């Protein structure tokens, strides 16, 4: 089994490159194609998918990205093209979304249905949670926290600091729409909680 090829990149297109390896030109499809530069000498990790009709080579920047690709295509209904689409967001983000069961973020990726997002999380959440703990500082720095998650974390921290209970915070969070104006969100949440307490006391 060939794990990687080393050679000179002769051409880069929107979703594939041509690698000159031992005098042969290999056409390789790759995620985040902008990472690969024409005339660059480099190692490319590969996965070859072969059936009775075609043989297609997919290429990756590093071994970890290759492993995640191989994991993804094990999911029923998830083919190589969808796996490449998923990896276009960065393999570091993929394992983060799966480890944290962020179905919403996965579902926003082209060609990823709710069913597929659930299947990925079900199959690999535990594995990728362990994977997350072993990331280097450079790899961890590439993880993008969705704005909504960041806002939610700020909101939760503020509400807890103000002394509200988890149940009260959840009640407010279900009712309001979070945005970058955390102060206003907190004010609205306090009003909702106060109204709820007032209504409860009247019963």
Curated annotation (Swiss-Prot):
<feature type="region of interest" description="Domain I">
    <location>
        <begin position="1"/>
        <end position="61"/>
    </location>
</feature>
<feature type="region of interest" description="Domain III">
    <location>
        <begin position="147"/>
        <end position="203"/>
    </location>
</feature>
<comment type="subunit">
    <text>Homotetramer. Forms an RuvA(8)-RuvB(12)-Holliday junction (HJ) complex. HJ DNA is sandwiched between 2 RuvA tetramers; dsDNA enters through RuvA and exits via RuvB. An RuvB hexamer assembles on each DNA strand where it exits the tetramer. Each RuvB hexamer is contacted by two RuvA subunits (via domain III) on 2 adjacent RuvB subunits; this complex drives branch migration. In the full resolvosome a probable DNA-RuvA(4)-RuvB(12)-RuvC(2) complex forms which resolves the HJ.</text>
</comment>
<feature type="region of interest" description="Domain II">
    <location>
        <begin position="62"/>
        <end position="139"/>
    </location>
</feature>
<dbReference type="InterPro" id="IPR013849">
    <property type="entry name" value="DNA_helicase_Holl-junc_RuvA_I"/>
</dbReference>
<dbReference type="InterPro" id="IPR000085">
    <property type="entry name" value="RuvA"/>
</dbReference>
<comment type="similarity">
    <text>Belongs to the RuvA family.</text>
</comment>
<dbReference type="GO" id="GO:0009378">
    <property type="term" value="F:four-way junction helicase activity"/>
</dbReference>
<keyword id="KW-0227">DNA damage</keyword>
<dbReference type="GO" id="GO:0006310">
    <property type="term" value="P:DNA recombination"/>
</dbReference>
<dbReference type="GO" id="GO:0048476">
    <property type="term" value="C:Holliday junction resolvase complex"/>
</dbReference>
<protein>
    <recommendedName>
        <fullName>Holliday junction branch migration complex subunit RuvA</fullName>
    </recommendedName>
</protein>
<comment type="function">
    <text>The RuvA-RuvB-RuvC complex processes Holliday junction (HJ) DNA during genetic recombination and DNA repair, while the RuvA-RuvB complex plays an important role in the rescue of blocked DNA replication forks via replication fork reversal (RFR). RuvA specifically binds to HJ cruciform DNA, conferring on it an open structure. The RuvB hexamer acts as an ATP-dependent pump, pulling dsDNA into and through the RuvAB complex. HJ branch migration allows RuvC to scan DNA until it finds its consensus sequence, where it cleaves and resolves the cruciform DNA.</text>
</comment>
<keyword id="KW-0233">DNA recombination</keyword>
<dbReference type="InterPro" id="IPR003583">
    <property type="entry name" value="Hlx-hairpin-Hlx_DNA-bd_motif"/>
</dbReference>
<dbReference type="GO" id="GO:0005524">
    <property type="term" value="F:ATP binding"/>
</dbReference>
<dbReference type="Pfam" id="PF01330">
    <property type="entry name" value="RuvA_N"/>
</dbReference>
<dbReference type="GO" id="GO:0006281">
    <property type="term" value="P:DNA repair"/>
</dbReference>
<keyword id="KW-0238">DNA-binding</keyword>
<keyword id="KW-0234">DNA repair</keyword>
<dbReference type="InterPro" id="IPR010994">
    <property type="entry name" value="RuvA_2-like"/>
</dbReference>
<keyword id="KW-0963">Cytoplasm</keyword>
<feature type="region of interest" description="Flexible linker">
    <location>
        <begin position="140"/>
        <end position="147"/>
    </location>
</feature>
<dbReference type="GO" id="GO:0000400">
    <property type="term" value="F:four-way junction DNA binding"/>
</dbReference>
<dbReference type="GO" id="GO:0005737">
    <property type="term" value="C:cytoplasm"/>
</dbReference>
<dbReference type="Pfam" id="PF14520">
    <property type="entry name" value="HHH_5"/>
</dbReference>
């Amino acid at each position: 089994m060939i794990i990687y090829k080393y050679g000179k990149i002769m051409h880069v297109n929107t979703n594939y490159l041509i690698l000159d390896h031992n005098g042969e030109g290999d056409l390789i499809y790759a995620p985040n194609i902008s990472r690969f530069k024409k005339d660059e000498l480099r190692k490319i990790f590969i996965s070859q998918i072969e059936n009775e009709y075609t043989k297609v080579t997919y290429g990756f920047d590093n071994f970890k990205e290759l492993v995640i690709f191989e994991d993804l295509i094990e999911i029923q209904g998830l083919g190589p093209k969808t796996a490449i689409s998923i990896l276009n967001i960065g393999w570091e983000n993929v394992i983060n979304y799966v480890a944290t069961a962020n179905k919403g973020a996965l579902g926003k990726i082209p060609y990823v249905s709710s069913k597929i997002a659930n299947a990925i999380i079900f199959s690999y959440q535990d594995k990728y949670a362990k994977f997350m703990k072993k990331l280097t500082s450079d790899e961890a720095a590439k993880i993008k926290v969705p704005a909504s998650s960041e806002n939610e974390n700020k909101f939760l921290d503020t509400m807890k600091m103000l002394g509200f209970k988890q149940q009260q915070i959840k009640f407010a969070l279900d009712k309001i729409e979070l945005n970058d104006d955390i102060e206003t969100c907190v004010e609205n949440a306090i009003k909702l909680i106060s109204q709820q307490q007032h209504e409860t006391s009247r019963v």
